[in-house]
Amino acid sequence: MSVQPTPADHFTFGLWTVGWTGADPFGVATRKNLDPVEAVHKLAELGAYGITFHDNDLIPFDATEAEREKILGDFNQALKDTGLKVPMVTTNLFSHPVFKDGGFTSNDRSIRRFALAKVLHNIDLAAEMGAETFVMWGGREGSEYDGSKDLAAALDRMREGVDTAAGYIKDKGYNLRIALEPKPNEPRGDIFLPTVGHGLAFIEQLEHGDIVGLNPETGHEQMAGLNFTHGIAQALWAEKLFHIDLNGQRGIKYDQDLVFGHGDLTSAFFTVDLLENGFPNGGPKYTGPRHFDYKPSRTDGYDGVWDSAKANMSMYLLLKERALAFRADPEVQEAMKTSGVFELGETTLNAGESAADLMNDSASFAGFDAEAAAERNFAFIRLNQLAIEHLLGSR
């Protein structure tokens, strides 16, 4: 398999990723600002499918209407010239000091109203750009001090904000879905909707939850000590995996935003295995963009930035090649059968069987030989060894 990406691979990048200047809480920028038009042309040259952005990645917070129109005109022309798409747009409700206590959940009602209006205006822009997904990351929605929030009221306000945005999308007839992005902490000490599980539970409380799903990120789930592949699997199973952010993370620490696969490589392999091959017994498959949300090393100049963009795509394609070979290997298929992976796809109850029927089945309870069943060798290590051998290219 070629590791030369093409638009058919549907790789996308946030403007804030390749455009990150290297500024962090401990140091100033190490690179100059990147012209969004240059970003479009360079990503297209590298074989990407699309580019995404927060409103203020592209248009400064305090831009005049004339400045806004000029920026959008230049950006749209670059998109037209290159064929690059904008599959997703999101809103910055975290950088400006007005959002220091959040947007949708700020204790200041006037700020909440401003934040919601900002989102609604940005939904219009997303629709104009042809985006299909509108991501909401509540980076400042949370607290450091438990007594500072009425937590029930905060969740009410979050629901109000998301439902208002979703209702607006429906009223306008836009071909957009909302994807909530969970994260446990950073920049807030504790962020509302910190994990995939929290996000799924929240969506169930929405009036317009039918067009609201999730945008899980590799590092965000791993920051909470969770298994990213399990998280996206549950979102996919619930048919709520609307978008995905791929990057690298090494353990429970700050959000590293490494190149995809440059953190937990085994986890990255099984993530790609799920995205490309789907569930072993069938089920929903992810068909959206493979979106990279990472930070190029601040130690590098722009040559290094573009090398890092290429590295994300190359890592994915290499892992895709390994994952396809893994599933196609007859020895792996036999090992999966031995381990009971396919048996798990069989319903526990027989067709038409009730709980009462099961209780009356003596072979399943009184006559069940638990000691003999306990002797079964599931051979999970052998199956995993085959996966690692494929990952390392030794098979």
UniProtKB/Swiss-Prot annotation:
It catalyses: alpha-D-xylose = alpha-D-xylulofuranose. InterPro entries: Xyl_isomerase-like_sf, Xyl_isomerase-like_TIM-brl, XylA_actinobac, Xylose_isomerase. Its EC number is 5.3.1.5. Pfam families: AP_endonuc_2. Disulfide bonds: none annotated. It is found in: Cytoplasm. This is Xylose isomerase. It comes from Arthrobacter sp. (strain NRRL B3728).
